[in-house]
Amino acid sequence: MDFAESPGLLINKLAHAMALDMDRRLKSYDVTMSQWAMLKQLWRQEGRSQVELQEFLGLDGATVTGLVQRMTHLGLIQRRPDPSDKRVQRVFLTERGRALEQITAVFEEEVNAHALAGFSADERVFFLRLLTRALQNCEGK
């Protein structure tokens, strides 16, 4: 199969190119793609447990623990014990973590606009539907 005929390779290459573009933009704020992905989850809902973040991000526990430690050290997030179960650590944004939401939202829009440049509005909608369906197929939904 030719490279251009392999959806998996093309999607992977697109994701990699978009991630590099986003990573380049985030670098000026000392944030990595993985850290930004966690911040996005916390912007949607603060106070998630590390296990919940692990599930949302599709990462293993050790990776999430390392991310949380680094992000705490950078002053992006803080951990607090769950009031009803002291064994559970809840993750909350700091002011610095909150402040990055609007800035990085612009970055995300720019990266997406760059990737979809030349697409009509209908093509964008159709492309996203196809990607969503392919993802659902792979996830068994």
What kind of region is each of these model predictions?
Residues Q45-S49:
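Short capping segments at the starts of secondary-structure elements
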Residues M1-Y29, L74, E95, C138:
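N-terminal leader segment of winged-helix/HTH proteins
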Residues R133-K141:
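A short alpha/beta connector and helix-capping loop motif
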